[in-house]
Structure formats: structure tokens, C-alpha cells
Amino acid sequence: MKAILSDTDPAKGCEPITCTRALGEVSLANQPLAELQRKRLVKAGFALSTTGTARDLFVRNDAWLSAAILSDLRQIGGPAVLRDAAGVALAWIGDPAQAAKTLTPDKESFLIRHPWDLLAIHEQVMATIQDGRIEGDVSPMATVEGVLILGKGSRLLPGVFVEGTVIIGADCKIGPNCYIRGATSIGDGCHIGQAVEIKNSIIMERTSIGHLSYCGDSIIGSHVNFGAGTITANFRHDGKTHRSMAGGQLLDTGRRKFGTIMGDHVHTGIHTSLYPGRKLWPNTSTLPGAIVKTDLHG
């Protein structure tokens, strides 16, 4: 059976990450989302195609489907549709309006509408990585506990501590004396420096988080610079799930830990503090000592 990623016009909601790139170009685990979708379809036994018939599977390109759901769709073979709770067809075989069988998404399958959906996909993908690969240089005074993929030309300096599943791209300088943990991916040409902690985050290419900073449960775009002492808060005092503005509405993210979403070319002044769930649009900046309580639009 063939599978076709069907082009859609996704509703706004994944900004500011998608202000400067298409949704399928967003880097998760240092791979474009569209490539991860294609790999998942192939692994489920589908042949990729750009055209298909009523016997083939069509998947929205802004939908993320679990391996289990893809297996179910492949076994059904005949007319069927996968609809979410809002009635949106995420995938279908034949005419979705006349499908004989309707499936319901599991917890790992959903329409990608908001930045926190991208974090959820990133966590799923990182959890499947079992083997590390070292193509750069690791100081004997660095510690790696977990799975590390380190790209060519990258260096882990003394005092670096890595745990969990971490991907670091090519030509990065990591350290000295920093802590990287959780499901974290760091793009090519990044600098993570002295006394910095990165936890469960996506850091895109050419970004610098040089010193005395914390970045947790966040998505940071490319060519971003953290001024010294920049802190992304990610936990509510009452322990409830975070809410974040999207499309003019305050939405529950479903996440107890949720940091900051930054677009490309953002610069923070020294000692900037960011409330959880706040978003900074591309090319915005903060002054030294700023407290970011609301989204910053360009």
C-alpha cells in the first residue's frame, strides 16, 4: 500500500517557530518534521508516493500518527478514516466522507496545532533512540550517562555532564562545565557554555547560550543569543499544567513543565527572566534585567 502526505493549509498556532519556516521544515531531533513523518510511514510498511488511488493511505502533513495507528490503518486496507475529537480527518483510505470504518487517534497521534505539540513529537522520537554515535571530540573530563549522538567537529569540553538522550549536531562547542539532560537536541554550529543547563529542549542551529543560563522544556530557534543569566521558568508554583496564548485564546498545554518558545534571531539581555509558556517572535530582543510576562511580537 502506498502512503501520500497530503498538503494542507495548517491553521496558525505554531508561531513563532513557523514564522520563518514551513511546518515540515521544523527541526525535531535534528531532522525536519516532514522527514520524520516519511520515515515513520516507511517503517510501518508503506511505500511513499506523491499520488495515489482510493486504495492508498492519505495523511495530512500537519498530523502526527503513532506506529500503532499506522499499523491499524495498514491492516484495515479498505475504506477508513482517522478522525480526532473535533471531527478532523487526520488520515484516510478512500473518500473520508463515505468511509465504512472510523478510527479514533491514540494519545500519541494528533493534529499539530501548537508549539507544545512539537515538543511532544520530539519527546516521542528521542525516546526511540537506543544507540549513541560519537563523531566529534569528548574530553576525558566530560561525563556521558545515557545516549549521546555527537556530530563531526563538535567538542565536549571538561566539566560537561550529559544524561538522558541528547543529540548534538556538527561544529558545536559544548562547555566547559555545563549540564545537558532529558530529551535534548542541539543543532549545528551551536555554543553551550559555562554554567549553562539545557533540559528537554530543542535548540536550533547557530544558537549561543554562552553562560550562566537555564533553558528547560523549550524550543529555541536558529541564530538566537542568550545574554548571560537568561532563565526560562518552566514550572508553576501550584503544580498545575501551563497555559499559553495561541490564536488569541489562552489554551491549556497539558504540560506541567513548559518553558519558552523563541523564533529565529532573538537576543536576550543579561539577566532576562521569562515566565513559563511565553513566546518571542523572530528578531525581538529584551533589555538587561527584563522580566518577560507576556508574548513578545515582532
Over which residues does each language-model region extend?
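Terminal amphipathic alpha-helical/low-complexity segments used for targeting or macromolecular assembly
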Residues: 1-137, 283, 289
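Residue-level recognition of short loop/turn positions
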Residues: 9-11, 60, 86, 153, ...
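Conserved short-loop catalytic and cofactor-binding motifs
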Residues: 22-25, 106, 142, 160, ...
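Short, surface-exposed helix/turn micro-motifs that flank interaction/cofactor sites
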Residues: 35, 155, 173-175, 225, ...
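A charged, amphipathic alpha-helical module
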Residues: 124-147, 152-158, 164
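Acidic, glycine-rich loop-and-beta core segments that form the ion-binding/anion-interacting portion
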Residues: 150-203, 207, 214, 218
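Glycine-rich hexapeptide-repeat left-handed beta-helix
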Residues: 194-195, 200-298
